A protein has these predicted regions:
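Positively charged, solvent-exposed patches that mediate nucleic-acid binding
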Residues: 1-114
Length: 114
C-alpha cells in the first residue's frame, strides 16, 4: 500500500475515532470519518489483546497486503481505521480480504456504491 494512503499521526486517529461511525464483523471493526483530503487514508490498529509484538506486526502486514488491491475501489475523502480482533490471527488470508471488502461496502465507502 502506497504511503500516501496511510493514516499515521495520532491526531488523525483521534479525529477519526471521535467523529467517526463504525461497522463490525468477526475479524475487524471499521471506523470511518469524512476527511479534508481528496484521497482515502487508511490506518490499522492492533491491540495487545491480539498477541505479542511479532503477531501484531504480522496481522498489520496481512491487513495491508489484503487491502492493497482494493485501495482504488474505496471512495476518496475518508479516513478509515481497521481495528483487528484476536480471531484474525487464525483467519485465512482470503477471509481477511473478504471481510475488509464487506465492511467497506456496508459502510458505503465502496466506489460503485458511493
Amino acid at each position: 500500500m502506497n504511503r500516501s494512503y496511510s493514516l499515521k499521526r495520532h491526531k488523525e486517529f483521534r479525529y477519526t475515532y471521535a467523529r467517526g461511525r463504525s461497522q463490525s464483523a468477526s475479524l475487524f471493526t471499521l471506523v470511518y470519518a469524512r476527511s479534508r483530503n481528496e484521497s482515502v487514508r487508511v490506518g490499522f490498529s492492533v491491540s495487545k489483546r491480539v498477541g505479542n509484538a511479532v503477531q501484531r506486526n504480522r496481522v498489520k502486514r496481512r491487513m495491508r497486503a489484503a487491502l492493497t488491491p482494493m485501495i482504488g475501489e474505496i471512495s476518496g475523502g475518508w479516513n478509515v481505521i481497521f481495528i483487528a480482533r484476536p480471531e484474525v490471527l487464525d483467519a485465512p488470508f482470503a477471509e481477511i480480504g473478504k471481510q475488509m471488502e464487506s465492511l467497506l461496502r456496508r459502510a458505503g465507502l465502496w466506489r460503485d456504491e458511493a
